[in-house]
Amino acid sequence: MTDFDPPLRLYLDGSALVSNWRALDERSGAARAGAAVKANAYGLGAREVVVRLRDAGCRDFFVAHWAEAEAIADLIPPGWISVLNGIAPSDISGVRALGAVPVLNTPEQLVLWRNTGGGRCHVMFDSGINRLGLSLQQISGGALAGLDVDLLLSHLASADTDVGQNNQQLQLFSQIISATTAQRFSLCNSAGIMLGADYHFDLTRPGLSLYGGIARGGMGAFIRPVVALSARLLQVRNVPAGAQVGYNATYTCPNATRVGTISIGYADGYLRAFSGTGQAWSGDKLVPVIGRVSMDLVTLDLNAAPELQEGDWIDVEYDLAATASVTGLSQYELLTNLGSRFARIWR
């Protein structure tokens, strides 16, 4: 197969990734920090992320699906991998062969695990988000009897904001601890780490902020960006004042404009929310997005950078917090939507 050079690049900063994990581990106090690497490490590439964090000292990795666990199981001891979405009867033979640890979420999963041999497991407790997990009544009623529960975990619903729900979940989680024989306890995501030591317990589970996301105010002081986007300039054309650009003629050139078309679009995760709001750069010169983002292409106003020519590379602005504010997309969406057509280049 021919090794073509993709016309769009995703640059990934491995030293920033490790720096972010170490900063979050330090701020976890007596707890140690794991890493959420589900959804292909939020779109960056799970294998590359796991190797770097493993070498930095991380020993707890969280994925959502069993296929995600299998994809990294040759890189670390399988017992370091936790699978958040539980088990189904069709999973059992593969689960046993793989050796990763299930997070059990329902009474039916508890029964299935017991009846198929038991062994080390984790359990999700629902402290108020009402997604996955067992209730206070179920755990207090003895649902975990006879199980070898290593980690009891729960998930904060609103840790990125200062609301009473955070303390309510903390109190409920603290209450359930005495009702279990679990060896370890975990409540915090990236934002939760910043709520203070009371929330840390034994293990924290950062995700977004590993990859450069600012999960809570103040984290910008120590979280470094990991992701940078670049796209090739495919064509430059001179467009007269009054001419319209892009689908549905949403942009009219106010004056004569050098319009550049770059190789990126919503098929790559650069969504239509960037239409008329996105920014790109040639060095320190702003070349803003004009017109509507299409599937494979974006148009830019190149008037500020007359030296640009076909074949040049353009840096596409992708600061997660700032871009989320402008587009209305979450930082999570901005990361996980990044498509497979990027050449992912670690440096």
Locations of the language-model features?
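Active-site anion/phosphate-binding pocket segments in diverse small-molecule metabolic enzymes
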Residues: 2-14, 18-21, 68, 87-89, ...
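Active-site-proximal beta-alpha core segment in soluble small-molecule metabolic enzymes
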Residues: 3-4, 8-19, 26-176, 181-186, ...
